Amino acid sequence: EQEFHRIRRLPPYVFAEVNAMKARARAEGADIIDFGMGNPDLPTPPHIVAKLTEAVQDPKTHRYSMSRGIPGLRKAITAYYGNRFGVDVDPETETIVTLGSKEGLANLSSAITSPGDLILVPNPSYPIHQFGFIIAGAAVRSIPVEPEHGLLEALKRAVQHSVPKPTAVVLNYPNN
């Protein structure tokens, strides 16, 4: 069995490990209430299915979108951020649309990282925060975030005490 050097560098995928534990517990007869990854357990509402069907049948949607995403969607995203968080984001230079957070973060990691760059990632965080940079060849340092110190203080201390200085620091909302 061939192993690839970038894959070998990855830590175990926490969601796969948790899924395996749930499967073992269920096989042993345990009644599991799953608070894991958000896989839908209800059908998609009919009005959403109808709108999707309508869009799929429209020949204008049978093409690739612009590489940064549909302009109207980018404007709607920036308006949301302005209304929700009070920030001014430019839809032309500060907003892109991706298929999801994993794709976006993996592409960002590859775009801004050179092999050997130091990247600081808070722990806990979403697995792609580490995985994307590891695949890009970076040296990732996991920074434990303790409730008594707080996320920003932990990252600030880590930056101050890092040699070499990090190329990037992942700043995420701790509960995603």
Spans of features found by a protein language model:
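N-terminal small-domain helix-loop-helix segment of the aminotransferase-like
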Residues: 3-4, 8-99, 107
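A general structural motif
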Residues: 32, 92, 116, 164-166
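Short glycine-rich anion-binding loops that position phosphate/pyrophosphate groups of nucleotides
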Residues: 40, 102, 126, 173-176
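Conserved beta-strand elements of the Class I
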Residues: 96, 118-120, 141
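Conserved PLP-anchoring active-site segment centered on the Schiff-base-forming lysine
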Residues: 111-127, 132-133
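A short helix-loop-beta submotif of the ANL/AMP-binding
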Residues: 135-140
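Active-site phosphate-binding strand-loop segment of PLP-dependent enzymes
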Residues: 141, 146-176
